[in-house]
Swiss-Prot record:
E.C. number(s) listed in UniProt: 2.1.3.15
Protein encoded by which gene: accA
Organism: Campylobacter fetus subsp. fetus (strain 82-40)
Pathway assignment: Lipid metabolism; malonyl-CoA biosynthesis; malonyl-CoA from acetyl-CoA: step 1/1
Keywords: ATP-binding, Cytoplasm, Fatty acid biosynthesis, Fatty acid metabolism, Lipid biosynthesis, Lipid metabolism, Nucleotide-binding, Transferase
Cell location: Cytoplasm
Protein name in UniProt: Acetyl-coenzyme A carboxylase carboxyl transferase subunit alpha
Domain of life the protein comes from: Bacteria
Family per similarity comment: Belongs to the AccA family.
PROSITE patterns: COA_CT_CTER
Subunit structure: Acetyl-CoA carboxylase is a heterohexamer composed of biotin carboxyl carrier protein (AccB), biotin carboxylase (AccC) and two subunits each of ACCase subunit alpha (AccA) and ACCase subunit beta (AccD).
Gene Ontology CC terms: acetyl-CoA carboxylase complex
């Protein structure tokens, strides 16, 4: 059963009308309603505001990392563990082939349904998750395998145990190591890009965002609570924070925006998967034409240019 957001009420009403017309066997009404549905979809999604895009980024039906991995990766094999503490299910690592190219995918996985959300810790990695990512990234470097990072997290887990095991050090270590990693890297925000939890696997030669994803230093609710002592002002915070793909592209903080199907990735998963796959292959082709030393040099220069203004 489809889930509808508040701004999709008009779409829901027409969907319900179509379902009722089908029950009555009124094919003429169904045809008319489908045309009306197309118009309503175009009107609704033509000019989404920042808060509506935030809701789309968090939509429960939106494809998660494993949806993309299982669809795009051929002969995929999961690699587990940080070899120091434990295997963190919030970070998943796979080796396989995309379009005939061998790659390693390192991704944040939220989990679908109560059981798996708890197992994946709602996509909030512990330090051992980031250390697993670093271990696998070093493996990719050793065998000269490109890395695809898929970012989708509310943020790094802020629990006492995570802090005791060095959460901030694990994130900082990844930022340092990934900036000089001698292999080609592509990072894509597929849903939520929450603060350091996203940055920890977000240092790459290409940083892109799906059209309806977000990337921010803090959640809008957290921002509103700090600035106005009122988390309910999250809509105003969302607008002020410039967290959408288009905003960040304009600010030159990301390289590319990957277009989604008209109604978003949650309504057309196959279309979103196809768009991501095509983007990855295109960027890999471009990066493979360059010497790896030049690739790393360009990556470092890009990182150092962030926040620098003439």
């Amino acid at each position: 059963m489809a889930s509808y957001l508040d701004f999709e009420k008009g779409i829901k009403q027409i969907d319900d009308d179509i379902a009722n017309a089908k029950i009555r066997g009124d094919e003429h009404a169904v045809e008319i309603l489908r045309k009306n549905l197309e118009k309503e979809i175009t009107k609704t999604y033509k000019n989404l505001n920042e808060f509506q895009r935030l809701n789309l980024a968090r939509h429960p039906d939106r494809p998660y990392a494993l949806d993309y991995i299982r669809a795009l990766l051929k002969d995929g094999y999961e690699i587990h563990g940080d070899r120091a503490f434990r295997d963190d299910p919030s970070i998943v690592c796979y080796i396989g082939y995309i379009g005939g190219k061998r790659v390693i995918v390192i991704a944040e996985q939220k989990g679908r349904g109560t059981k798996y959300k708890i197992m994946r810790n709602f996509g909030m990695p512990h330090p051992e998750g980031y250390r697993k990512a670093l271990r696998i990234a070093r493996l990719a470097e050793k065998f000269e395998i490109p890395i695809i990072f898929l970012i989708d997290t509310p943020g790094a887990y802020p629990g006492v145990g995570a802090e005791e095991r060095g959460q901030s050090e694990a994130i900082a270590r990844n930022l340092f190591e990934f900036s000089e990693l001698k292999t080609r890297t592509i990072a894509v925000v597929i849903g939520e890009g929450g603060s350091g939890g996203a940055l920890a696997i977000g240092v790459a030669d290409r940083l892109a965002m799906m059209k309806n994803s977000v990337f921010s230093v803090i959640s809008p609710e957290g921002c509103a609570a700090i600035l106005w002592n009122d988390p309910s002002k999250n809509e105003a915070a969302t607008k002020a924070m410039k967290i959408t793909a288009d905003d960040l592209k304009e600010l030159q903080l990301i390289d590319d925006v990957i277009d989604e199907p008209v109604m978003g990735a949650h309504r057309d998963k196959e279309g979103a998967i196809k768009a991501l796959g095509e983007y990855i292959l295109k960027q890999l082709d471009e990066l493979e034409k360059k010497d790896i030393n030049d690739v790393v040099k360009n990556r470092i220069e890009k990182i150092l240019s962030v926040g620098a203004y003439a």
